[in-house]
């Protein structure tokens, strides 16, 4: 009950904060869905519609997408991220482990248009690659970055961060 009350209060406060709405077409959304070797479920379609409505509104979004392992939460997240990228915003996709971050990164590379600027920031990246990624995020040369909690540090500055996905 206390968790519910805390989340309710957070949602109320977030709704009061104004933001720039994202304007996007359904073209990247539809192209990505057509690449899938399965059809989205009605629940996935509804989740995407709700997320897209929130993204295009003037209120901040705080949404929990829940489901069993393999239920398609990642696909829904990636498709919604593509719409944000299409609106010229950056996306940060944080996973709890480096292995999972790499899996999401590889899936995005398969699904997203080839010209999408996608990077993985990991502890296995050498110091020069990390510095390059940090600079590219700051200069909006990267549209979506995947990583662990390391993508949220003081030295990492996004040019135009518009969407954060946290996979728990």
Predicted regions and their residues:
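Signal for well-folded cores of large energy- and translation-related assemblies
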Residues: 33, 37, 52-56, 109, ...
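Pre-Walker A segment
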Residues: 1-93
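Walker B beta-strand of ABC/ABC-like P-loop ATPase nucleotide-binding domains
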Residues: 65, 92, 157, 165-166
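Walker B catalytic acidic pair
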Residues: 148, 167-168
């Amino acid at each position: 009950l206390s968790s519910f009350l805390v989340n309710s209060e957070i949602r109320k406060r977030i709704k009061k904060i104004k933001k720039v709405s994202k304007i996007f077409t359904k073209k990247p959304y539809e192209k990505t869905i057509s690449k899938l070797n399965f059809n989205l479920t009605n629940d996935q379609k509804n989740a995407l519609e709700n997320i897209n409505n929130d993204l295009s509104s003037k209120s901040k979004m705080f949404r929990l997408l829940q489901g069993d392992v393999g239920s398609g939460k990642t696909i829904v997240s990636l498709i919604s991220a593509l719409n944000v990228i299409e609106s010229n915003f950056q996306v940060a996709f944080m996973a709890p482990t480096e292995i999972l971050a790499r899996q999401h990164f590889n899936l995005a590379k398969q699904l997203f248009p080839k010209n999408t600027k996608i990077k993985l920031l990991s502890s296995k990246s050498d110091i020069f690659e990390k510095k390059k990624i940090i600079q590219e995020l700051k200069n909006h040369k990267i549209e979506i970055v995947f990583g662990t909690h390391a993508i949220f540090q003081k030295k990492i500055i996004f040019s135009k961060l518009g969407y954060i996905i946290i996979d728990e």
